């Protein structure tokens, strides 16, 4: 798997534009989809610029987009918004095929040790049999903390589509991972 984070976000030492936008969208505007989508558009443009620089449209190694299953308590899901907006006839959003098969508390409140115990085995890929196996998958996430969610999503993909190249992009990662828990 190849992976990138567009930004480094740190709680005690400073905030970044991307980190602040994610925070506002996820925790203040999550139940106001119209306002959240306006803010999310900024993140979408940043992500598009990154992807075009890294993978020119004519040479994209993936034809599938996915994001880990979201917290269903929100009315607006940032990663779903991004995957839907990035999808096209040649790059399909197949996120609905990656499902949570075991519930656990919100990842944000779990310690690193709890994540290692609770996240593995919590996702399953149930492929749409009417669609071909993708030649490559771009996994999109909003915040990378311990990496356990990304690992679990990749594990679920590997079970069904072994050897399929995976590319992971997170909008931001926490520089102070694990120190606040």
Briefly describe each language-model feature range.
Residues 79-95:
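Glycine-rich phosphate-binding loop and adjoining helix at the ATP-binding site
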Residues 104-181:
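PRPP/pyrophosphate-binding module of the type I phosphoribosyltransferase fold
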Residues 28-29, 72-73, 144-147:
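Short acidic, S/G/P-rich loop/turn micro-motifs used as interaction or catalytic elements
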Residues 1-61, 100-133, 176:
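Active-site-facing substrate-recognition patch
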Residues 59-70, 137:
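Short glycine-rich phosphate-binding loop at a beta-alpha junction
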Residues 69-79:
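Glycine-rich phosphate-binding loops at beta-strand->alpha-helix junctions
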Residues 66-70, 93-106:
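A short, structured active-site edge motif that brings together acidic residues
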């Amino acid at each position: 798997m190849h992976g990138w984070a567009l930004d480094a976000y740190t709680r005690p030492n400073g905030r970044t534009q991307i980190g602040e936008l994610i925070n506002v969208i996820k925790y203040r505007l999550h139940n106001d989809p119209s306002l959240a989508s306006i803010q999310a558009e900024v993140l979408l443009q940043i992500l598009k610029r990154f992807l075009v620089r890294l993978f020119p449209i004519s040479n994209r190694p993936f034809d599938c987009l996915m994001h880990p299953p979201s917290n269903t308590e929100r009315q607006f899901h940032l990663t779903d918004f991004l995957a839907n907006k990035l999808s096209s006839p040649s790059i399909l959003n197949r996120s609905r095929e990656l499902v949570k098969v075991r519930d656990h508390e919100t990842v944000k409140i779990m310690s690193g040790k709890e994540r290692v115990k609770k996240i593995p085995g919590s996702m399953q890929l149930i492929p749409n049999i009417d669609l071909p196996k993708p030649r490559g998958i771009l996994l999109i996430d909003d915040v990378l903390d311990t990496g356990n969610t990304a690992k679990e999503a990749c594990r679920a993909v590997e079970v069904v589509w072994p050897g399929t190249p995976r590319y992971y992009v997170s909008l931001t990662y926490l520089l102070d991972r694990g120190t606040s828990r």
